[in-house]
A protein has these predicted regions:
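Glycine-rich portal/gate segments that line the openings of hydrophobic small-molecule binding cavities
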Residues: 39-91
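Short beta-strand segments enriched in hydrophobic/aromatic residues
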Residues: 10, 21, 55-57, 92, ...
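Hydrophobic ligand-binding cavity/cleft-lining segments
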Residues: 1-38
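Short, highly charged C-terminal tails/helix-capping segments
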Residues: 148-155
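Hydrophobic pocket/interface hotspot
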Residues: 17-18, 27, 51, 77, ...
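Beta-strand/loop substructures that line and gate deep hydrophobic ligand-binding cavities in soluble
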Residues: 78-79, 87-139
């Protein structure tokens, strides 16, 4: 198991970024790498609340962890600190023992330079998930998050 970190500055206040982290309608718009679509099955954004999300590959050559072209994960919100931090404990839905086990995803927001510094720390990632893929997917999601939230702040 390993840990990845990714960060990005977003030109919007922490409150706007936090809202996108906990709004189930926003999740499919940003929390997905390019080449995939996102489906939110359940999403109860409160401490102890649970969620279930699937990422579907757009092309036939995508190999999923939960199915032929799908990565499904579920989890719970371990901590929600408005405008500051979201801590999630997540697990892939898979029969592959090399992909099983709980991971912790911590997103920290800090007001900085008229916007928000966002740090995502993904701990306990199974070694069977290539670190470069995990890092790239997180960076793509942060790029989408920035586009979504900055677009709202500019409007």
């Amino acid at each position: 198991m390993y840990t990845t970190r990714a960060s990005r500055h977003i030109d919007a206040p922490p409150s706007a970024v936090y809202q996108a982290l906990v709004d189930p309608a926003d999740i499919p718009r940003w929390r997905v790498p390019y080449g995939m679509t996102c489906q939110v099955h359940d999403f109860d954004a409160r401490e102890g609340g649970t969620f279930r999300v699937s990422l579907h590959y757009d092309t036939a050559d995508g190999t999923g962890k939960s199915g032929a072209r799908t990565d499904t994960y579920h989890g719970r919100f371990a901590e929600l600190l408005a405008d500051e931090r979201v801590v999630e404990v997540i697990e892939f839905e898979t029969t592959d023992p090399l992909l099983q086990g709980a991971m912790t995803l911590t997103t920290t927001l800090v007001a900085m330079d008229g916007g928000t510094a966002v740090l995502v720390v993904h701990e306990g990632v199974p070694d069977a998930v290539p670190a470069a893929d995990n890092e790239a997917g997180t960076r793509m999601a942060l790029e989408r998050l920035a586009s979504l939230v900055e677009g709202r702040s500019a409007g």
